[in-house]
Amino acid sequence: MKKTVMTVDDSRTMRDMVSFTLRGAGYEVVEAADGQQAMSAIATTKVDLVITDLNMPVMDGLTLIRRLRAIPAHRTLPILMLTTEADDGKKAEGRAAGATGWIVKPFNPDKLVSVVQKVCG
């Protein structure tokens, strides 16, 4: 059975690139434009991994991670940050919120697939 990955980013172009890359590698992909949309979608869709941007309107990536981690069913859900932020302080905030890993944009498609395979198979 295919693994399902949720990609959360306010940039349609970025969601399209991530989705294209992961679908090409055999994953199902669910998209959300911000953290609030992601929370709504994840309530009705089982996902094996969340890949989220940091800076988004309505609900940012750190808030999304904290809210997901507060739900018992999602405490161990792998969550990757995919963002332009490369600052060590931001990475520390991400880890403290519960992020599993961090990938800096622009991303290398092969590296993204490799990380996703390591994290969720």
Name these PLM-found stretches.
Residues 2-13, 18-22, 50:
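Conserved acidic segment of CheY-like receiver
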Residues 26-33, 41:
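Short hydrophobic/Thr-rich beta-strand motif most characteristic of the beta2 strand and flanking loop
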Residues 45-51:
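Active-site beta3 strand of CheY-like receiver
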Residues 56:
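Receiver (REC) domain active-site loop signature in two-component systems and cognate sites
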Residues 107-116:
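C-terminal output helix
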